[in-house]
Structure formats: structure tokens, C-alpha cells
Amino acid sequence: MSFTDKVMTPFTPVEVEKVDGKIKVSVIGRTYTIDNGEFFSSIVANGEELLASPMRVVGTEDGEEIVWKVRRTIIQSHTNERAIIVSALESKMFDLNISYEFNYDGLVNCKLRIMTTSYNMAQRLRLEPWPTWKYQLEKLWIEVPMIKEKTSLYSQYPRSDIYQNGEVLYKNAAVRASGDIPEGNIHLPFKALFWVGEDERGLGFVCENGKNRQPIDWKHHVELEENGDERIVRYRLLDSQPVTWDDPRHDATYFFRPLSFDIGIMATPVRPAPKTPFIHNAIQILVNDNVKELAQPIEGYDNHFDFLKSLGITTLVLHETWNLVQNYPCLDQETEASFAWLVKEAHKREMKVMPYFGYEISSLSPTFENDFEKFRTKPRDYFMDATWWRNPPQRDFAVCQNSEYSDFLAEGIQKLNEKYPFDGLYLDGTIYPRGCVNAEHGCGWTDPYGNIQATYPIMGARKLLQKLYSIFEPTGGIINYHSATLNFVAMPYTHMGWTGESIQVDLIREGAGDFPIGFAKTEWTGRNLGVAMEMIAYPNPPKWTIDHATGLGLVHCIIPRPFYPRMNWENVKYLAKIRKAIDKFPFEKADFFPYWRKNDIVASNEQVKCTYYVYEGINGKKQILLFCSNLSTKEALNVAIPLDGYEMKVLNTNAKVNDDGSFDFGMYQCAIISFTER
């Protein structure tokens, strides 16, 4: 397919500057500095420093702390797309080589190679005595001292329990995939993706596998340790002599092979965050063999298209059932005819169409036997195979993005788009990097004890998104990611995220009463990552209603996307009213004030949270868009919100029906039931 490796919009070429021994590498919104040390001395993201002190490689050799001497740091190559820098370090007994590949989107692929040092020439000629080194490497860690106030939030994958002092602090749960970092020190098992930051910026770490790692135990692959004004992110690579170096031969200089450790580092946001958090007004619709029902009259309109247009809908998101064969990009005749008609009718009304493509290969696919084994994700545990069932009756199996399926899917989508130009993609789980041991496409690896371990296809998902982005970005299309993890490595090549589905089961069953707000602050605002967000919500009254979803969402800059028929038309119209009120506000010129920061506008009842945007016009008058929500399970009565100094006529444009709130001398008075918005 036509895929470019060139710098794509909105990114800028990689810039490299070497001054006084410092090498600065800048990409859009971020700067990494190597200052003659063993790792980064500075990482600036979104205008602010993340590191409290330089990153470091910590180790112990023969019982003594390793002291590294940096011998050379070299700019190996530099193009618009990437820069490669290598560093050579040595200690008393070991040599360390580090290779950095800086990509224009901000991902830095780091490779550490440690090996035993050799004898110098004088020792070889017996002019100096041979050293009696044991070459014992008892410890090797990477430590990242971050500014503590920049590390209030986390995100993890694979999801697991979170431990403190060896005991479970948080049980593994969907709502614990991301959240507030607790006080004290914590430790976690292996993480393929790990992000630490706050609501405007952060630092991500990526490891596709755990090759050569020997932490003290499986619960201590990653640690967060408080140290005054620092929070240290620690990767325990080794806590004992490498098993592969367990060699009876005496001359370790020749018989101990280099150990390699790969770790990717990526400061966020991965692209400039959009000024407006609401980049389109979409509805997800369930279409299959009844697609022509969209041509039927509804609510006094000649057809569904005109009705949706009247509600302000700009984008039709097609549920998976639009394609009779799940995810197969070569459409059958019936699906192709329906899709061509739908795109034509939507475009007549200047509405966009985003069809669904997911993460599976279908048993209904005509090439299933040929493709299944080589494309599929093969988990370590056979019984953990990810499958789906849908009508017409078919089984759908998760594919691995490290396989050739990625090329097959991208090429099929490109051909379909050339034939019936559409406006973007609804990617369901496509960038979710399931652990895979399928050797047919290169996944899986064997540890020193003979056990097969999983590869997490993070880079494969990233490459697929790069290909799809190159198709749709030039024409103004929208690519979403919809995943149960924050795969920040692939996010540069998306425009928005659709979040919330992974936690719907909990919300549907239990309601939002115990919802950990840290999850929302991490995954919903999008400002820390650089992409707009939209909520997927499936109401289940009375425990989980559209009111609850909207109230929980708006104070985190996210709004539920209507989904018909899972939401009735009344819910769709309700959300449309809110969107029409929101769309009047000039987000591009406004400042953002989330409730979790110290702001001027605070409700009299601490149960009620206020998030708002302020725009000051050329006449000096301030306009405000204020979202208030009671994030508790109790009703908040007689709530007062101070709004003196703002244009009340703007504030009084309240999207709620039958608003019984009132303004009195710059104070807004109202009552708010639990988990609803004003």
C-alpha cells in the first residue's frame, strides 16, 4: 500500500543540537537532553520539566556500587524522521552501550547492552598484572527521578494488582487500569505499558517483552518510591547474577555474552492537545440488514438522516454489524451495496461516516483456514483465547498486530476508501496489545528456564496506525482508538479516544457510587495524552443512567456518545441539547480550569465539583462555560456557586430541562442530586 515514512501532520522534523557536551533532541512539544551522563538529564513536556534529577543506571559489581564513566556520546545519524545517538560507558568490570532512536512523534527506543570489560593492552602484554575480577553483576536498575508534583496519576498494562510492602493495595479491576498514585511506595509486576504523570503531561515506558530480566520477585518489576520532592520510577532489570552468565569457564571476558534490555520512553502529550475537547458530534448506530430503515420517516422528518441532522449530529459511527463478516475489509455484495448507499446519503447532508474495524479474524471469512494460525493471537494459556460471537453466526478470534494481518487490513481499508470515500475509522481494540506466543509471526520467547513467555505487539499496533493515519489524515478524516489500555505509543496516529466501555460492567451493576475519580482524571480529559476523548456509556436505569454518565463525564471534559438503539431517542435528544449549548462556546480562545486544581469557582458543598472554561472577549467581559456535578451518592441541597464578574446571560444558557436554579447577586443557587450535572 502507499505508506509514507515521512513526517506527517501535525508533527515537525526531529531537531538535534549539540552544545557544550549536551545533546538536545526536540520533537513537537517535547525536548530530551543527554548531558554527558548515562541517561537523560532533562525531559521537558508541554513546556515543563518532568525530571527532578538525571535518569541513571544503578548497579552493583562484586558487592560495590557501580560508578560509570562516560567515554563517548555520538550522534550516529539524523534525518527529519529520526535521530540515532549512541553512548559508550564503562565501570571497573563492565561496559555499557546505550542506543537511542528518537522518532519524530516523540518515542525514544532505548537499547541497553551490558557486557564484561576486557583487559587493556598493557595487561595483555603482561606489562601489568591481570586483574582478579569475579564479574559479579548483582544488580542493574534503571531509575527515573521525576518531580513528585508531576506524578499524581498512573496507567498500567497488563492490568494487575498493585502492591505496597508485599501486600495487595488495590485488587486488579478495570477501574484500576489507571488512577491516582497512592501515598507511599508501591510495586507492580511486569508492565508492557506504564505511564506516570499528571493531567497536562507525563512520561510513558514501553517494553514489548521481559527478556533477560531477573527482578527480586515477580511483583517487583516496576517500583514507585517517594524520596522527598521526587518520585522515583524504578525498573529492576537484574537483582542477581544473570542466569545466562552461569558459566563454569574461568575467562568471563570471552564467555559472558552481552545482555540486552529494551525500553521505550515517551513523554506526553504525544501531539498538541486540541483546544476543544469535543471535536465532532457523533452518534453510533446499529446497522445491518435493516439499514434501509434509515430512509423511513421519523419524528416528523422524511428520514432518519434529516432527523439526526436536526439534532446537530455531524458523524455517523457504524456499529460492528454494518459488515456481515466481522472486520473483513473485502466486503460481500450485500454489505457493499448498503455501505455505498449509506455513505452517499450521509454525504448529501454533509455528515461523516466512520465504519467499524476491530481486532479479529472471522470464521465466516473466505480465507479463514489460510489465515487463522498465522494471524491469530496465541496466548500462553490456551483457555484465554480471545473470541467473540455475533450474527450471522460466526466466531471471531483476536489477531496479533505483529502478523501480516496488519498489512492485509490496511490495504483492504485503503481500497475500500478509494472506492467509497468515507471519513475515518472506528477502531475497536485494534491497538490493544494482547500478549502473544505465536512463533509463526515472530512472537514469544523462551526464558533461561525453558518457559515460553509472551510478546506484547505494541510496535505492530503502532505501525498499523501509522499506515491508517497516512490514508485518512490528508483528507481530514478521524481515526479513533478504542481500547482498554492507554497505548500511548500508537496514540500519535489517532485523533481521539473512545473510552468507558471497559468499565461499563461495573457501572451497570453497581452504579457510580464507588467510582475512583483518578481513573477519569487519567483517561478522560485527554490533555495529558494529546487526544480528544468521548465516552461510551450503556445506561441501565436506575443504577446507571444517562444523567449519571453525563454528570460524571462533563466535569472531566468528556460527554457520552449517543448509541441507538442502546439509548432511546429521548436520551439521544437530551444529549443533543447539551451539545448545542456546549458548541456555542469559543473553546479555542478559552482557558481551562478543572475541579481538582485550586480555582476561584468552588461550590459551597464539597460534594459538588466545578470544572469550567473562561473566555475574555475584546470588550473585557468574561464568558464562562461551567460544568458542575455532584460526585457523591447523596443529594446536595442549597448549593451556592460564586460567579460574580461573569456574563450571566451566557451562564444562564443551561442545557438542563426545567432548570430550577437561580442567580442572586452573582451567586448561582441550586440543588443537585447525586451524579448529575448542571
Located regions from the model:
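An acidic-aromatic substrate-binding cleft motif
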Residues: 1-34, 260-329
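Beta-strand/loop-rich accessory regions of lumenal/periplasmic or secreted enzymes
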Residues: 2-256
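C-terminal beta-strand-rich structural cap/linker in extracellular carbohydrate-active enzymes
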Residues: 260, 658-678
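The substrate-binding groove and active-site-proximal loops of carbohydrate-active enzymes
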Residues: 281-298, 319-336, 390-410, 421-422, ...
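Active-site-adjacent "subsite" loops/lids of carbohydrate-active enzymes
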Residues: 293-298, 337-339, 344, 353-420
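Aromatic- and acidic-residue-enriched segments that line the glycan-binding/catalytic groove
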Residues: 329-337, 361-389, 435-448, 493-502
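Active-site neighborhood of glycoside hydrolase catalytic domains
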Residues: 398-495, 504-506
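Active-site-proximal substrate-binding groove within the catalytic cores of carbohydrate-active enzymes
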Residues: 457, 462-653, 665
